[in-house]
């Protein structure tokens, strides 16, 4: 689910050494931006990347970062919170369905939902 709709839209990083990525030269000290939505729907990594499939395995998404020193410290807590939230929500409202337009947050950093009408 986090691969399909990442809560963080992008992160900016500083290039540590001169490098070339897909023919594009990038010099040390330059800033680059990684867009999570693009990385999490990369056709080279995910078969049918625009298909919502919670059984996808393996699922090497980068919703919590790509590893190393920038990996999200709270990712394990976030996964537990999501599991508990969905278990409780679905046990109380098993037939919950969308009932109107989703209103997204207006943010250049966080990709959240402001409101989402549902019916059950």
Regions found by a protein language model. Name each.
Residues 1-24:
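Conserved cytochrome P450 K-helix E-x-x-R motif and the immediately C-terminal K′/meander segment
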Residues 65:
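Short acidic/histidine-rich active-site segments
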Residues 1, 26, 52, 68, ...:
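Hydrophobic, well-ordered secondary-structure elements that form the walls
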Residues 10-13, 29, 42-46, 62:
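Extended hydrophobic-aromatic, low-complexity segments
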Residues 35-59:
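Conserved cytochrome P450 K-helix/beta-meander segment immediately N-terminal to the heme-binding cysteine loop
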Residues 111-120:
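Short, basic/aromatic-enriched C-terminal tail that caps enzymatic domains
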Residues 77-105:
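Cytochrome P450 heme-binding "Cys pocket" and the immediately downstream C-terminal segment
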């Amino acid at each position: 689910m986090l691969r399909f709709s990442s809560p963080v839209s992008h992160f900016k990083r500083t290039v540590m050494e001169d490098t070339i990525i897909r023919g594009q030269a990038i010099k040390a000290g330059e800033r680059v931006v990684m867009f999570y939505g693009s990385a999490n729907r990369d056709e080279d990594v995910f078969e049918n990347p625009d298909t919502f499939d919670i059984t996808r395995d393996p699922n090497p998404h980068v919703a919590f970062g790509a590893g190393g020193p920038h990996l999200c410290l709270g990712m394990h807590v976030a996964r537990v919170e999501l599991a508990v939230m969905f278990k409780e929500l679905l046990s109380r409202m098993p037939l919950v369905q969308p009932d109107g337009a989703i209103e997204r947050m207006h943010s250049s950093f966080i990709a959240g939902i402001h409101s989402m009408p549902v019916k059950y």
